[in-house]
Swiss-Prot record:
PANTHER family: GLUTAMYL-TRNA(GLN) AMIDOTRANSFERASE SUBUNIT C, MITOCHONDRIAL (PTHR15004:SF0). The gene is gatC. HAMAP family: GatC. Gene3D superfamilies: Glu-tRNAGln amidotransferase C subunit, N-terminal domain. This is Aspartyl/glutamyl-tRNA(Asn/Gln) amidotransferase subunit C. It catalyses: L-glutamyl-tRNA(Gln) + L-glutamine + ATP + H2O = L-glutaminyl-tRNA(Gln) + L-glutamate + ADP + phosphate + H(+); L-aspartyl-tRNA(Asn) + L-glutamine + ATP + H2O = L-asparaginyl-tRNA(Asn) + L-glutamate + ADP + phosphate + 2 H(+). Signal peptide: none annotated. It comes from Rhodopseudomonas palustris (strain HaA2). SUPFAM superfamilies: Glu-tRNAGln amidotransferase C subunit. Keywords: ATP-binding, Ligase, Nucleotide-binding, Protein biosynthesis. Its EC number is 6.3.5.-. Pfam families: GatC. GO terms for molecular function: asparaginyl-tRNA synthase (glutamine-hydrolyzing) activity; ATP binding; glutaminyl-tRNA synthase (glutamine-hydrolyzing) activity. InterPro entries: Asp/Glu-ADT_sf_sub_c, GatC.
């Protein structure tokens, strides 16, 4: 798969990132390099390899799975520009 300049501009638009025309070729190369690396990963033979969560064998410390509201909802939303009933209000982005 190859990314063209139009795709770079579309990705930037969807991500709400301002990209100049001078930056498009560089970003196009970066995205193509990332996709090429992912394609290489799909070719790796992983038969017989067990999934792992860490490169070092260690036991993870476990804690009780207890629902907790944190009791700081007012502090969490204190700096938000708009809130309602301890929820953040954000502009609609999907029509």
């Amino acid at each position: 798969m190859s990314v063209d300049a139009a795709t770079v501009r579309r990705i930037a638009h969807l991500a709400r990132i301002a990209v100049t025309d001078d930056e498009v070729p560089h970003l196009q190369g970066e995205l193509n390099a990332m996709l090429a690396f992912v394609e290489q990963l799909s070719e790796v033979d992983v038969d017989g390899v067990e999934p792992m969560t860490s490169v070092t064998p260690m036991q993870m410390k476990k804690r009780a799975d207890v629902v907790n509201d944190g009791e700081i909802a007012d502090q969490v939303v204190a700096n938000a520009p708009a809130t309602e009933d301890h929820f953040f209000l954000v502009p609609k982005v999907v029509e």
